[in-house]
């Protein structure tokens, strides 16, 4: 069962890649190259898929002397502490961000993250995933103003 609610004969777990030293480095390096010409304030996305990607992006961008702030979007705001739904360095109203996630099927998690950002006045118009399963995410995200880019498409794996 996928997070989108759909059933599938295969499950792509991006954390198997992003929680290894080599995988985290490679994903971060590729995404940094994909966003190098973007005028943006931060990169982040829905927990849990975006968590290791955001951490790797922050670290590698710092090492490369082009630091990028990162953030994580919770499914719901915390009921204690800061009571925020968007965690990380404070994003100001009007900030422009790029969303990231490990896998996109329908795009639901990315859309929910965008809605949370919309509520605080943060602008997201692009999302990058490691794998696009090619099951509707491109069209669904376009409906909410997000352009989806991916490192891989499902067809790249012969699936």
Locate predicted features:
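Active-site-facing substrate-recognition patch
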Residues: 1-39
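Short acidic, glycine/proline-enriched helix-loop-strand junctions
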Residues: 37, 53-68, 139-154, 158
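Short glycine-rich phosphate-binding loop at a beta-alpha junction
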Residues: 39-49, 128-129
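Conserved acidic residues
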Residues: 41, 95, 125
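Short Gly/Pro-enriched loop/turn and capping motifs at secondary-structure junctions
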Residues: 78, 103-106, 131-136
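PRPP-dependent phosphoribosyltransferase catalytic core
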Residues: 115-159
